[in-house]
Amino acid sequence: MVEGRAAPRGRTLAASSPAGTIAGLGRFNAIMALVHLVQAVALLLLSRDFRLPVTLSYLKFDPATTSLRPMVTTVAEVPLAWLVVAFLLLSSLAHLTIATVYRPRYERDLLRGLNRARWIEYAVSASVMIVAIAMLVGIYDLGALLMLFSLVAVMNLLGLLMEVHNQTTRQTDWLSFWIGSLAGIVPWIVVAISLWASSSYGDGQIPAFVYWIYVSIFIFFSCFAVNMWLQYRRIGPWASYLYGERAYIVLSLVAKSALAWQVFAGTLRPV
């Protein structure tokens, strides 16, 4: 160990966290796998066939005006229910994996103040969530959707980097946190611009549930960053990494459930 370097976070955690608490998290993951799966199956069975287009924008030469004109073509129509079911199933699979085959590695990582599996799952499931929200507000361009997906994925992978990198630092290095926060806020700005454009230049008839989705899921996404901040500041019960881990699991369930059932109530329920 480099002289003057503080002990790794995991050593303090290992000394202060009873094994029973870690075992409890294993069982909690198994329960969460079932809860997400039940919701996914219910939504798949109950939802009507509501599809949104995926488009491509391109330039085409107009011989009449001898200029290039922007064009849009629809390349696919995606059932919205599939997107909702996808992020629920991804979470269910991740929790099941953590509770079973990955559990020994998961428990070792928890003792070090680390959870790789969480960030990898979020990098995919949260990215699908933002794509669903973007399509609800009228963002259909494939390139734009891919960029939004990628930004949220990068945000979560920087969360992974934050935990891995700070295994070896004397003091918490917040660079990954702030870059991840920057990447994570951009999709919400893009969605807000689309909402504003629809209100200003469209017919202004944006369903109220779309605004509720935007506000509620933005708040939930922000709570993940707050949870990490509290963990690394060791404030109150967050002094134990396991408390923050349980908070992540609960936040993930609530955020995904809130989005899924708001989308169902607004667009997918049978009429």
Predicted regions and their residues:
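Polytopic alpha-helical membrane-helix bundles and their juxtamembrane interface segments
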Residues: 3-34, 38-115, 126-271
